[in-house]
């Protein structure tokens, strides 16, 4: 492959890296925490990010404590 072709390939790979969506490696560390129902019993629906599933999953939250991987709505956890 010519040096021009290599430069083009390098440029395209760099552009792809910059434009790809945020991956799980770039997520804050709290996304690695498991869903935590907490000790209270005011059960309500919440969402958490599952690194194993690579998606947001609904779970039942007790209403207090828990951890930072806990969102009220799907929209909230995607932002």
Swiss-Prot record:
It is found in: Secreted. Keywords: Disulfide bond, Protease inhibitor, Secreted, Serine protease inhibitor, Signal. Disulfide bonds join 40-64. This is Scutellin-5. Serine protease inhibitor. GO terms for molecular function: serine-type endopeptidase inhibitor activity. Residues 31-79 form the BPTI/Kunitz inhibitor domain. InterPro entries: Kunitz_BPTI, Kunitz_BPTI_sf, Prtase_inh_Kunz-CS, TFPI/VKTCI-like. The keyword Signal applies. Its main location: secreted. It holds the Pfam family Kunitz_BPTI. Residues 1-24 form the signal peptide. GO terms for cellular component: extracellular region.
